[in-house]
Amino acid sequence: MISRTNTFQHIESYFSRRFLELADGNVVAYREVQPEKSNRVCVIIHGLTGTSYSMLLLADAYRKKGFQTIVVDLPGHGGSTPIPVEDMSSLARWLHVVLQEICPNHRLALLLGDSFGASVVLAYAQRYALLPTTSIILAAPIPLIHPVLSIADRFFSRVPDTIARQIYYTNHFLLSVRIRFLLAQWRRPDYRYYVAECIAIEGAQANHRYAEMVLMPANMRSNPFLSPLSEQLASQTVIMYGDTDRVAGLRAARYLRKWGNSAHIVQVPQCGHLIHIEGISDIIDASVSKQNH
């Protein structure tokens, strides 16, 4: 059993846990912190197998920069209600409604999507006009699904939630393998412990079958990274990925450089797929630079 670190407990104490009920009756869970005299809002969308909890280290870095920071739980994650999702436009509409509720005064300065969350953010940005002053960060995106990941997804989509949790979240041997796969700097004990803690905390909240059988297939059916990046959107976007991202792979990195050639592209050194842990300082630097541009 992984005990919670003082670091996470301390950071979590800054954030209020909130639940928003939408007009259709669905609930959206999110974490929020609002520093004094803050007039910039940063909204973060997490990845497929995580929740808002795993984004706390990154969210706290934005808090320290004076951002009102909101980390939203995707449908079926954390405390958010699962919703019917036909394709990524369904999630784009969902995010549009959520942002109208949590950012009613259009003060959104920064919208960041991590991993699968990057696909959600991109799908939203392609369909809804953002203010020119809003910056978009696509962190550790997965523009192309590696064949090995496709096989793994098909396998896990057929596994019951209880068994999937044992395999994916609580098996100690596989936990070690997963950490080495996700992190470039896996020898760092603090990084290993952070990842292990997130996996342990979030495993109990995982709606595995919904993620693998609803959300992932929706992304495969209507991958937003297959659509050209408009000139306006490119001017607002920073694409960031780790140089040792084994989840997306080198093929995805080459695709991103070609697809987003007019956007600001940052390859983070000594960083794997968990850029929200290993690449926090790089993300903050890119965000501040984009805001000041």
In which residue ranges do the predicted regions lie?
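Alpha/beta-hydrolase fold catalytic core
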Residues: 1-42, 64-67, 292-293
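Active-site loop/oxyanion-hole signature of alpha/beta-hydrolase fold enzymes
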Residues: 71-112, 116
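Conserved alpha/beta-hydrolase catalytic His-Asp/Glu region
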Residues: 147, 169-231
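Flexible "cap/lid" loop of the alpha/beta hydrolase fold
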Residues: 126, 136-167
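Catalytic histidine-centered segment of alpha/beta-hydrolase-like enzymes
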Residues: 271-281
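Conserved HGGG/HGGXW glycine-rich cap/lid loop of the alpha/beta-hydrolase fold
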Residues: 32-79
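Short beta-strand/loop motif that positions the catalytic acidic residue
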Residues: 233, 239-241
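Acidic catalytic loop of the alpha/beta-hydrolase fold
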Residues: 244-248, 273
